[in-house]
Structure formats: C-alpha cells, structure tokens
C-alpha cells in the first residue's frame, strides 16, 4: 500500500483545500415582485426580465 514519503505541511494542505468551498448564490432584488430571486432564473411568480413568461399554478 502506498505511503507518503513526507508529511504534508499545514500550508500545503490548506492550499489544496482552498478550492473546496461553498459558493453563495447570486441573489438579486426583483423590482417586479418586490422579492429576492436567483439571477438568470424565473421568479416564483413567473416573471423574467419584467415579463410574465410562466403562469404559476394555484396552490390549494
């Protein structure tokens, strides 16, 4: 079984793990609905770029 020849230092370990992170979603304020939504996505009420593109279903 392979064994590392040298111990990995804290710096090298942290540099390697520096790319492992959670990205925050790009959230913007939607002036049409007055709510926040993720960029380049249709809002929950069916608006995209100020136009209604999808008619939302009624929640019963």
Curated annotation (Swiss-Prot):
Parts forming coiled coils: none
SUPFAM superfamilies, sorted: Zn-binding ribosomal proteins
Cellular component terms (Gene Ontology): large ribosomal subunit
Alphabetical list of InterPro entries matching this protein: Ribosomal_bL32, Ribosomal_bL32_bact, Ribosomal_zn-bd
A Gene Ontology biological process term: translation
Top-rank lineage group of the source organism: Bacteria
Keywords, ordered alphabetically: Ribonucleoprotein, Ribosomal protein
Pfam families per UniProt: Ribosomal_L32p (PF01783)
GO molecular function: structural constituent of ribosome
HAMAP family hit by this protein: Ribosomal_bL32
PANTHER family: 50S RIBOSOMAL PROTEIN L32, LARGE RIBOSOMAL SUBUNIT PROTEIN BL32
NCBIfam families in the cross-refs: rpmF_bact
Family: Belongs to the bacterial ribosomal protein bL32 family.
Name of the protein in its database record: Large ribosomal subunit protein bL32
Gene: rpmF
């Amino acid at each position: 079984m392979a064994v590392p020849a040298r111990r990995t230092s804290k710096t090298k370990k942290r540099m390697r793990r520096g790319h492992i992170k959670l990205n925050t979603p790009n959230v913007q304020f939607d002036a049409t609905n007055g709510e926040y939504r993720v960029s380049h996505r249709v809002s929950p009420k069916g608006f995209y770029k100020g136009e209604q593109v999808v008619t939302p279903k009624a929640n019963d």
